[in-house]
Amino acid sequence: MVLCGVCAFLGLYCTQPLLPLLETVFHASKTAVSLTVSAATLGVAIAAPVFGILTERLPRKKVIVASVIGVSIPTLLAATSQTIGQLIFWRLLMGLTLPGIYAVVVTYIGEEWPPQRMALMMSFYVSGTALGGFLGRVSSGVLAETFTWRTSFLAIGAVSLAGAGAIALWLPPGRGRPQPRPSAAGSLGDRRGVVYQVQELFRIRRLVATFAVGFNVLFSLVGVFTWITFHLSAPPFSLSTTALSYLFVVYLVGLVVTPTAGYIITRVGLRAGVAGAILCSMVGVLLTLAPSLPAVIVGLTLLSSGVFVTQTATQSHLRVASPPEARVTAAGLYLTCYYLGGTAAGSVPGIFWSLGKWPACVAFIVCMQAAALAMAVIGWRTQAAQAESAAA
C-alpha cells in the first residue's frame, strides 16, 4: 500500500519547486507555468469517473500495475518538451492515467480489510502518498539545479517504471472482492444506467459533503505549495530551486502523523478527526505570513500534516457512506472533485496574487478551508445524529 501511494504521487507535483525556473527557461508567465501543475490534476479529474465505471469489474491488481506503467511513459516524454505548451500536454496525459491507481487502491483496501482496520490501512496508503510527494518534489528540484530540468523527468519516469515492477511482484491479488451480483434495472449496481447511478450518488448528502471536502482539501494544499514558491523565491527570502525543493521535507512528517491519525480517528470518530485536522491546516496557512523562514516551515508542516489526516478521514468516510454496489464509481466521483480542487488551485489563487501577492492568497485559501470545516461537521452527520438533534 505504501509503494502504491509513492508511485501515485511521485510525479504529480514534481514541477512545483521548478516553477520559478520554468518561468525563466520558457519565458512564460507565472500563470502559464502553474498550468504544469493544474494540467496533471485536471487529467485526473477528467479520467477518474471513467476509470471508476470501466474498472469496477476488472482485476484490481492488474489495473493498478498498468496505470503505474501508464504514468511513467508521459513523464519520460515530458523531458523532450521544447515549449511550455508541450510540457503542459505531457503533464495532462500523465494525469489521465493516474486514476487507475487512486480509485482502485481505495476500493482494494475496502475489500481486503475489515471496517475496523480500514482507517489504519488507508493511513498507510496516505503515508505512501506523502513519501511520494516528498521524493518527487525534492528530487526534481535537486536534479534540475545539479543537471537540467529534463533530468528530473527522466529520473522520476524511470523510478515509476521500477515501482510498477515491484507492485506486480509484491501486491497480492484481491481475495475479499465480492462476486458480481445481478442488479435490478435502475438500481445503483445496474451497469445499463450509469447516469442514473451517478445521479443517485449525488443525492446522498453525506457523499456530496465528502466530495466538497475533498475539493477544498486539495485546493488548500496545492494552492499553498504552488504559489508560495513564487513568494519564497522573491526577497526577503530569495530561495534557490534546490532550497525550494527542500521545503517539501515537511511531507515526511506525514509519514509519522498519518498512521498515528488512523488510530486516533478510530477512537474519536471521523467528524471529530477531520475537524481537528482542518483547524490544524488553517493555523499552518496563517503561519506562512510570518517574515521568518522557520515560522513558514512550521506553518507548512502543520498544513501538510492536517491535510494528510483529513485525507485519511475523508477516504474512510467515503467508503462508509457509499452504497456497496457503487463504491468504485463513488471513489471515481470523489477523485474528480478532489482533483478539480487541485486544478483550480493551480490558477485561481493567481487572481488574488495579482491583487495582493501572498497575503491575499492566504486569506482566500483560509476561507476555503473554513468552508470545508463547515461541510464536514454538518454534512457528515449520520441520520441517527440528525434525528437526535431534531428531537432535542
Question: Which residue ranges define each predicted feature?
Answer:
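Conserved MFS/SLC helix-loop-helix module at the cytosolic interface between two early adjacent transmembrane helices
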Residues: I46-G85
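Helix-to-loop junctions at the C-terminal end of transmembrane segments
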Residues: A48-P59, V256-G269, W353
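Helix-loop-helix hairpin linking two adjacent transmembrane segments in secondary transporters
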Residues: Q86, P115-Q116, F124-W170
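Cytoplasmic helix-loop-helix junction between adjacent transmembrane helices
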Residues: W90-L131
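Juxtamembrane intracellular "pre-TM" segments in multi-pass secondary transporters
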Residues: P172-F211
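C-terminal transmembrane helical hairpin of 12-TM major facilitator-type secondary transporters
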Residues: R271-T314
